[in-house]
């Protein structure tokens, strides 16, 4: 499906769908979400293929990501890189550089008490969207 809608309370349905998207990655995952928290590791990244690398671009207020990332890297190796930027608003998941999904809400709160969606990004739009976020990634700050 190109669009999946979630009613308020359909947290598990969202969880299943996003895990299916993450599981489809063969090389890399690039997640952009200004409000990520530590749950990104336990709820979603554990389902990825162990060889798949992950980049997380989050907002400057997402302090809980740093200790979780450190513990994750300690256990699984340097497969995750986290940066922060105040230049992001969207929530986007890129898979292997050629597929992408937009989340209507932040991943950490998706479908808790409001409706949301996951929409596939059109293949002809992905290169431009990815290029824009790669540029932000380059100027983003590493969590220290």
Question: Where do the model's predicted regions map?
Answer:
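Exposed extracellular interaction/assembly regions and N-terminal maturation sites
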Residues: 18-20
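PLD/PLD-like phosphodiesterase catalytic module centered on the HKD motif
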Residues: 1-15, 24, 30-31, 35-144
């Amino acid at each position: 499906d190109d669009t999946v809608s979630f009613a308020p309370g359909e947290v598990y349905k969202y969880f299943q769908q996003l895990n299916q998207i993450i599981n489809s990655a063969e090389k890399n995952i690039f997640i952009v979400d200004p409000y990520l928290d530590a749950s990104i590791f336990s709820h979603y990244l554990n389902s990825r293929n162990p060889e798949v690398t992950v980049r997380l671009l989050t907002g400057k207020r997402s302090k809980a990501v740093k200790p979780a990332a450190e513990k994750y890297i300690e256990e699984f190796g340097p497969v995750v890189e986290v940066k922060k930027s105040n230049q992001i608003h969207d929530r986007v998941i890129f898979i292997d550089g050629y597929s992408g999904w937009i989340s209507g809400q932040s991943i950490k709160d998706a479908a808790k008490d409001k409706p949301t969606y996951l929409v596939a990004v059109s293949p002809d739009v992905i290169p431009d969207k990815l290029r824009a976020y790669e540029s932000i990634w380059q100027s983003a700050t590493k969590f220290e």
